[in-house]
Amino acid sequence: MKVGLFIPCYINALYPEVGEASYKLLTQLGVEVDYPLDQTCCGQPMANAGYERDAKALAERMEALFAKYDYVVGPSASCVVFVKEGYPRLLNDYREHACIDSRIWEICEFVHDVVKPTSLPARFPHKVSCLLYTSDAADE
């Protein structure tokens, strides 16, 4: 399985160690991970501020950039939920959806539901994001 690691813009700018830790975790679990260097923002800040055209352009870019991966995994529930729930509306005329549905996962969901390790060789202080509980993604 080939995974495209989606590192949201705010994590890249403010918490780069989260991106590095995400990469290390996935590779240590035996996942083939690629980090597309050309990735930018998923478009959530623009969509939230009402700039739909700008958000759509970023969504189309992200869809094209991550089209070749079996899964897209990101360490931000907020951005993952935006892609799952916001992209179908933004991209209603866009034919090829690379990330929609089961292809994009929040990293903890992906490790638990897809990779399914029997053990982790480390302590894992994990907190489930409250956003996952209030979104449609929580039902999946």
PLM region descriptions:
Residues K2, K127-S129:
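Residues that mark the start of a beta-strand
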Residues K2-C99, S135:
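Cofactor-cradling patches in redox/metallo enzymes
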Residues L37, I104, T118-S119:
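Generic preference for hydrophobic/aromatic residues in regular secondary structure cores
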Residues A98-V114:
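Short, flexible loop segments at boundaries between secondary-structure elements
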Residues P117-K127:
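Short, structured loop/turn "capping" segments at alpha-beta junctions
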Residues Y133-E140:
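Conserved small/polar residues in nucleotide/adenosyl-binding loops
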